[in-house]
């Protein structure tokens, strides 16, 4: 099994030659520890920084030096379009208020398919279309990155004792 402890940012992957890919759903890309297989059937497991979300185009570097390209798998998503920007912003506000992972593109929003959310968004006057597409939501304001993922992890799969005396 290929053991992964390092993530290579997508920008750096443009200069790398890789032969292995792994296709992952959003829920898999959020895991700090996960076992799966490459698209050609090679076993791999990663041990990366907790809270890190793998992004489409990033690389996973194995302990033995092999590099695997991360591909965002197609998933059931709801795509939201509107007649104007104001409507789209209102939908983003209401979905964000429900803490829904949200992909924000210039002319549409997308979230993992949920018929209750679809009904809410339609009730706001927007168009919701079911689709099969890669899902790359915003990483959030507190993750230290902008846009759809990014960053760099050098987690090495070890833990530290964080025992603190908290006497008051």
Curated annotation (Swiss-Prot):
Gene Ontology CC annotation, any one: cytoplasm
InterPro entries membership: UreE, UreE_C_dom, UreE_N, UreE_N_sf
Coiled-coil portions: none
Pfam families xref list: UreE_C (PF05194), UreE_N (PF02814)
GO-annotated molecular function: nickel cation binding; unfolded protein binding
SMART domains: UreE_N
Basic residues bias spans: 151-161
Localization of this protein: Cytoplasm
Gene Ontology biological process: protein folding; protein-containing complex assembly; urea metabolic process
Keywords, ordered alphabetically: Chaperone, Cytoplasm, Nickel, Nickel insertion
Region (Disordered): 137-168
Organism domain of life: Bacteria
Known role: Involved in urease metallocenter assembly. Binds nickel. Probably functions as a nickel donor during metallocenter assembly.
Family designation: Belongs to the UreE family.
NCBIfam families listed in its UniProt record: PRK13261.1-1
Protein name per its UniProtKB record: Urease accessory protein UreE
Protein source organism: Saccharophagus degradans (strain 2-40 / ATCC 43961 / DSM 17024)
